[in-house]
């Protein structure tokens, strides 16, 4: 189960938000017992790139053996 403040991985591109599949965000609000989430995506320096409402199928939990990959945001 994904809870508030958990890190999640985006499963699809959201070009209108400048986000790509694999970007990592923080859940700031859980909707309808996990049917959807409000997720904040930030730069590594903490600047907010986007806060988006996503369906549960759009994100997944981070795995214990994953590593974050940095990319520039245009």
Where does each model-flagged region fall?
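Predominantly soluble domains enriched in secretory-pathway, periplasmic, or organellar proteins
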Residues: 74
């Amino acid at each position: 189960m994904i809870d508030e403040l958990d890190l999640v991985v985006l499963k699809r591109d959201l070009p209108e938000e400048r986000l790509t599949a694999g970007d990592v965000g923080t859940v700031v609000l859980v909707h309808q017992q996990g049917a959807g989430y409000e997720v904040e995506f930030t730069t590594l320096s903490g600047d907010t790139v986007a806060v988006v409402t996503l369906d549960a199928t759009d994100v997944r939990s981070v795995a214990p053996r994953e590593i974050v990959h940095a990319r520039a945001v245009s």
